[in-house]
A protein has these predicted regions:
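Structured loops at beta-to-helix junctions and adjacent beta-edge loops in soluble globular domains
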Residues: 14, 63, 146-148
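Solvent-exposed loop/turn segments at secondary-structure junctions
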Residues: 15-19, 67, 80, 93
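Acidic/histidine-rich, surface-exposed loop or edge segments in extracytoplasmic proteins
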Residues: 47-56, 76-83
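A structural motif
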Residues: 62-75
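Activation targets extended, charge/polar-rich intrinsically disordered C-terminal tails
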Residues: 76-222
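Glycine-rich catalytic cores of cysteine/serine-nucleophile enzymes that process amide/ester linkages
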Residues: 1-52
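Short coil/turn segments at secondary-structure boundaries
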Residues: 54-62, 86-89
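Extracellular structured ligand-interaction cores
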Residues: 8, 57-59, 95, 140
Length: 222
């Protein structure tokens, strides 16, 4: 958002064409192309409210120069020849892509409160997916089929940032350290800007579960 220029736009790295040939198969293989999309805030907020999805906003504590650089990076990334990227669910997704642009835009370095590269989380990719797919058993079942054994290896905090909630947490603790060694918080303030009143229970999938389906199949075969 830029009050001076009258800009209130949302850059979304999560756009894709579900009707593209072999979308699900290519997604499972990690060969899906996503792209950066831009929309005005009002349409974005209306869509998320309709879908029952709350939205948190983190106001970044950037200098005017850093803001201009970030806008320039996003604008360049949105050029037709640059906006499409090879999506990877764990390593290059709609959460990690904007992080890279923010880290490039700042003058200095972005320092996180925790050691981001140490394998000290005690969690794996599969652990995180199970945590955030609770109540969506068929989705969890499909993801388990697609993931290999490496999904069970411990990951570090930076890799865990493929989950937006972890990105949010680590950004809240991060500091920008400029070239003179002066530090300031990355996030100036945080607020919920789309409030739907929905709870996780509202999104729990109903009907037969994968385990029930397998049990039924065994009974029929027997």
């Amino acid at each position: 958002e830029n009050y001076t220029r009258g800009i209130d736009a949302v850059f979304n790295y999560g756009m894709f064409n579900f009707n593209a040939p072999n979308f699900i198969f290519r997604f499972a293989l990690g060969e899906t192309d996503y792209q950066l999309g831009v929309t005005d805030y009002e349409h974005f907020a209306a869509e998320y409210n309709y879908l029952g999805r709350d939205v948190w906003q983190q106001t970044l504590n950037l200098t005017e120069e850093e803001k201009e650089r970030l806008i320039a990076l996003l604008t360049e990334n949105y050029r037709p020849e640059n906006r499409v990227y090879r999506y990877n669910f764990f390593y290059d997704n709609c959460a990690t892509s904007p992080r890279e642009q923010i880290e490039r835009a700042i003058n200095g370095t972005l320092q996180y409160a925790d050691n981001m590269t140490a394998n000290s989380t005690g969690i794996s990719f599969r652990d995180l997916l199970h945590k955030y797919s609770e109540g969506h058993l068929w989705s969890r079942f499909g993801m388990d089929l697609c993931m290999g054994s490496k999904a069970d290896e411990p990951i570090n905090r930076r890799l865990a940032m493929f989950v937006p909630f972890y990105m949010q947490e680590y950004f809240n603790k991060a500091q920008i350290v400029d070239k003179e060694g002066q530090a300031r918080p990355l996030v100036a303030k945080e607020e919920k800007i789309v409030v739907t009143g929905k709870t996780p229970a509202d999104f729990v999938s109903r009907g037969i579960t994968p385990m029930q389906s397998a049990s039924l199949l065994l009974i029929l075969v027997a």
